[in-house]
Amino acid sequence: MSRVCQLTGKRANNAYAVSHSHRRTKKLQEVNLQWKRIWWPQGKRWVRLRLSTKALKTLEHKGLDSFAREAGIDLNKF
């Protein structure tokens, strides 16, 4: 499974690791993804999602149903 947030679509970023002598090598900055079980009140069940920690904070603010609607995700498939 690819390392992509299921709600925000956030994925890895290409960057440079810069040494003291300023030599640059490419590195991958991965997203901080967590598996999370979230109670879905409208579906009356738990939904297991792979979310970035930024999405978890936004989820507490917006709520699961409205956040999934914004992202265009059908929660019945999870």
UniProtKB/Swiss-Prot annotation:
InterPro entries: Ribosomal_bL28 (IPR026569), Ribosomal_bL28/bL31-like_sf (IPR034704), Ribosomal_bL28_bact-type (IPR001383), Ribosomal_bL28_sf (IPR037147). Signal peptide: none annotated. Keywords: Ribonucleoprotein, Ribosomal protein. One of its GO terms (biological process) is translation. GO terms for cellular component: ribonucleoprotein complex; ribosome. Belongs to the bacterial ribosomal protein bL28 family. This is Large ribosomal subunit protein bL28. It comes from Cyanothece sp. (strain PCC 7425 / ATCC 29141). The lineage of its organism: Bacteria, Bacillati, Cyanobacteriota, Cyanophyceae, Gomontiellales. The gene is rpmB.
